[in-house]
Amino acid sequence: MLRELVKNKKLRARVLERAEEFKLNNRAEENVWFRELILCILTSNSSFISAYKALNYIMDEIFSLSEDQMSKRLRLAGYRFYNLKAKYIANARKLYGNLKTKIKPIADYSQEEARQYIINNIDGLGLKESSHFLRNVGYFDLAIIDRHVLHFLNEIGTSNLKIKNKKDYYLAESILKSISINLGIQVGLLDLYIFFKQTNTIVK
């Protein structure tokens, strides 16, 4: 089922085009890395569409808005967790100027270590969100396990797998890495195929 999508030349070209955009982000300036970080904070426990809409409500004034003003903007955008995410974003602003210089050298050496560094140092990002951020700035060795990917794993018979802790995430990631190797694609891009399979679109 997924193999047919991977073999689809038109879809594969779209995924590879998206991958090139992520690689460009890797070479981009701090503002691009920061924007991707904020998007991933907003995507946590929310849909990409909702997160992207919320991002556009705050990004132009993200450094001038108070936490309370940011919360109100997010609420106006129809975003659910406006108070909590405003707090996370306000804290993330303190990283601006050092985000890329801190994370890139670690990720260039070990993407797993970079993911753990992000989890330890940036509020609001867990395994999924940290993997998502790293993928969006050009690192493709980590799995992004959202509800679409979980649904896919359960579809192919992985015993109703649920992500309740790190152990569950790492187990699911190991399964996805095996699938990716078998399909000849990088695991950080696998979710794009799965997302397309379930929604008929590529965003993220």
Curated annotation (Swiss-Prot):
* CDD domains found in the cross-reference section: ENDO3c
Tell me the lineage of the source organism: Archaea, Thermoproteota, Thermoprotei, Sulfolobales, Sulfolobaceae
Q: Which family does it belong to?
A: Belongs to the type-2 OGG1 family.
Which GO annotations describe the biological process of this protein?
Answer: base-excision repair
Which InterPro entries is this protein grouped with? DNA_glyclase/AP_lyase_Ogg (IPR012092), DNA_glycosylase (IPR011257), HhH-GPD_domain (IPR003265), HhH_base_excis_C (IPR023170)
Reaction(s) catalysed (UniProt annotation):
2'-deoxyribonucleotide-(2'-deoxyribose 5'-phosphate)-2'-deoxyribonucleotide-DNA = a 3'-end 2'-deoxyribonucleotide-(2,3-dehydro-2,3-deoxyribose 5'-phosphate)-DNA + a 5'-end 5'-phospho-2'-deoxyribonucleoside-DNA + H(+)
Which SMART domains does this one have? ENDO3c
Provide any one GO MF term from the record: class I DNA-(apurinic or apyrimidinic site) endonuclease activity
- On whether Lyase is a keyword of this UniProt record, the answer is yes
Q: What does this protein do?
A: Catalyzes the excision of an oxidatively damaged form of guanine (7,8-dihydro-8-oxoguanine = 8-oxoG) from DNA. Also cleaves the DNA backbone at apurinic/apyrimidinic sites (AP sites).
Name the encoding gene, please. Answer: ogg
User: Manganese among the record's keywords?
Assistant: no
- Native source species: Sulfurisphaera tokodaii (strain DSM 16993 / JCM 10545 / NBRC 100140 / 7) (Sulfolobus tokodaii)
This protein's name = 8-oxoguanine DNA glycosylase/AP lyase
Q: Which residues form the active site?
A: K128, D146
Q: Which UniProt keywords apply?
A: DNA damage, DNA repair, Glycosidase, Hydrolase, Lyase, Multifunctional enzyme
| Enzyme Commission (EC) number | 3.2.2.-, 4.2.99.18
Q: Which residues does the UniProt site feature Important for guanine/8-oxoguanine distinction point to? A: K204
List the Pfam families hit by this protein, alphabetically: Ogg-HhH (PF22175)
